[in-house]
Regions:
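Helix-loop-helix transmembrane hairpins and adjacent membrane-interface loops
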Residues: 1-7
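Active-site-proximal alpha/beta segments of enzymes that process anionic O-linked groups
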Residues: 7, 11-52, 57-195
């Protein structure tokens, strides 16, 4: 009896996984008409540059910027305008769920809104910003890809690398430098680091 019940549950989970895969594949269609109705809050002539770094396996407790006893962030410590978030926890312990929640309004309680809504990159675009998304991860037809590819410029730097290559997150900085030199008055960049 227990074996039959576990097979039945397995079938339920497989069916749910197939349904989710279909819903995910249809993201472009189901979110097409979504809008934030966002607008800029600052003078259009003032330069604004925002960089959101999603550090995957990087741990705040190992950053000097967050009080770690070794100075592991000497350059960040000297920069003006750096904002650290000290009271933030992820709502999921898996990349495929936590990163989309960071890039959107979705939470663990209403994760399904991802199928109908766009992310923070689109909000910045609506507000008149040039947007960029650069990732040191491989694309995998997930919400991370979909939300990232809403940007004006996007690149997954591991995509063209030899299989199994270990690419340093520093490589993302060349893409940031290129965006900064392009002279966009309003710029929002998301870096999805390997950590």
């Amino acid at each position: 009896r227990d074996l039959r019940m576990s097979r039945g549950l397995g079938d339920v989970y497989k069916r749910q996984a197939a349904e989710r895969a279909g819903e995910t594949a249809g993201y472009a269609e189901t979110s097409r008409d979504f809008t934030f109705n966002a607008s800029a809050a600052h003078d259009e002539n003032s330069r604004e540059v925002y960089v959101l770094v999603i550090g995957e396996t990087a741990r705040a407790c190992n950053f000097g910027l967050y009080g770690y006893e070794r100075n592991t962030t000497p350059l960040l410590d000297k920069m003006e305008g750096v904002v650290t978030f000290t009271d933030v926890l992820t709502q999921s312990n898996t990349t495929h769920k936590s990163v989309p929640m960071l890039l959107s309004a979705a939470s663990a309680e209403d994760y399904d809104c991802l199928y109908r809504q766009k992310g923070i990159i689109t909000a910045f675009k609506e507000a008149g910003f040039h947007t960029a998304f650069f990732s040191n991860q491989l694309p995998n037809h997930s919400f991370i890809d979909f939300l990232g590819m809403e940007a004006d410029d996007w690149k997954f730097i591991k995509k063209d690398a030899p299989k199994g290559a270990n690419i340093s997150d520093d490589e993302l900085l060349f893409l940031v430098e290129k965006e900064l030199k392009a002279g966009h008055q309003k710029l929002f960049i998301v870096l999805h680091a390997y950590g």
